Amino acid sequence: MWIKGKAWFNNSIDTICIQIDRFIKNIKKDCKPDIEFKENQLILPASIDMHVHVRGAQLSYKETVATATSEAAYGGIGLIIDMPNTLPPVNTYERVIERIREFENYSRTDFGIYSGVTKEIEKIDTLPIAGYKIYPEDLDRTETKVLLEKSKKLKVLHPEIPLALKVPRKLRNIWMEIAALHYVQGNVHVTHITNYETVKIAKELGFSTDITPHHLLVNGERDCITKVNPPIRDYLTRLGLWKALFEVDTVVSDHAPHSKEEKNLNYDLCPPGIAAVSFTTPFIYSLVFKDLLNIERAVNLLSKNPAKILNIPYGEIRIGYVANFTIISKNDWKYRTKFSKVTETPLDNFPLEAKVEFTIVQGKIAFDGKNVLPIRGVNAFDKSSRYPV
């Protein structure tokens, strides 16, 4: 199949034809396209979200693989990586295999999964996973030290020391975030950083980094809807974090859904988490349309850099790479979730200028501007089902 339209290709915008099946087979100037996108629509490499809590399994009342990945496709994301803290947790050989099968059956986007810290490192390391997630409570564990020494796979760090989980939320200070960096070494990615100092030190230590939109935009923790880990920081800290948008490697959603009943509990009892996986892509490209960010930086943040961190052939319009695309237009609208089980977020009604018109996954339309189609994504880390390069 041939598609044609304006595209971000070779570091510029040009009208090109792209031949696709599951992969990008050819790129040239002209063709007789099967699909031709409108003049006001722009073809981009599909976004990659390295930090999504899909839930499912015994937590399906919060969110399922189908609803989370449908919401991701609606937000222009072609690949999500799932966190292991569902129920039961994904931290054994058997649970990793079960989790992969759950995604194979129900995912509307391509996917990868992280394992939790485990005693079964040698067995799990043989499986097609994205890497491992290290939580604050893991930092003092012997298994974490073994993991850091033995596994070459990516380790994603929640940057807070164990003490942060034992003190009142108002005392979960920035120094606890910075101190956590010194517990780890090697192939480490530091996620949902909340302040600029942590970004600088993490980069000095050779780690890749990300931030979330809500740590930039949400005006303090006012209630259960805005409660999140790590906590939303004060105004000046959030203002400083905007500098990080030009230095971090990627932007993630940290999509963390909970039921309405859970979010209606007393503030001290309600679980933390904001679920807006579909917000990140239109938000970042809205900054481009506002001339606050250039398009090359936006594509690097959402597509090219996460693919490099994960060491997979995604994130670029390039022959041999996976045929995942986001098609956007300049269009004023106000944000709402659409396919997620979560219907209320602190980002609701946020004004955006970029709108996702289509999401293409594995060469097939996953989101057509109105509906998510019943396609099946693949495990981006399973080389047997992946790509020819």
From Swiss-Prot:
Co-factor: note: Binds 2 Zn(2+) ions per subunit.
Cofactors (names): Zn(2+)
Catalyzed reactions: (S)-dihydroorotate + H2O = N-carbamoyl-L-aspartate + H(+)
Pathway(s) of this molecule: Pyrimidine metabolism; UMP biosynthesis via de novo pathway; (S)-dihydroorotate from bicarbonate: step 3/3
Keyword Zinc set for record: yes
Residue(s) carrying N6-carboxylysine: 133
Gene3D superfamilies xref list: Metal-dependent hydrolases (3.20.20.140)
GO biological process: 'de novo' UMP biosynthetic process; purine nucleobase catabolic process
Its EC number(s): 3.5.2.3
Coiled coil feature spans: none
Active site annotation, chain numbering: 254
Binding site for Zn(2+) 2: 133, 158, 192
Alphabetized GO MF terms: allantoinase activity; dihydroorotase activity; zinc ion binding
Function noted in UniProt: Catalyzes the reversible cyclization of carbamoyl aspartate to dihydroorotate.
PANTHER family for the chain: ALLANTOINASE
Identification of the protein by name: Dihydroorotase
Source organism of this protein record: Sulfurisphaera tokodaii (strain DSM 16993 / JCM 10545 / NBRC 100140 / 7) (Sulfolobus tokodaii)
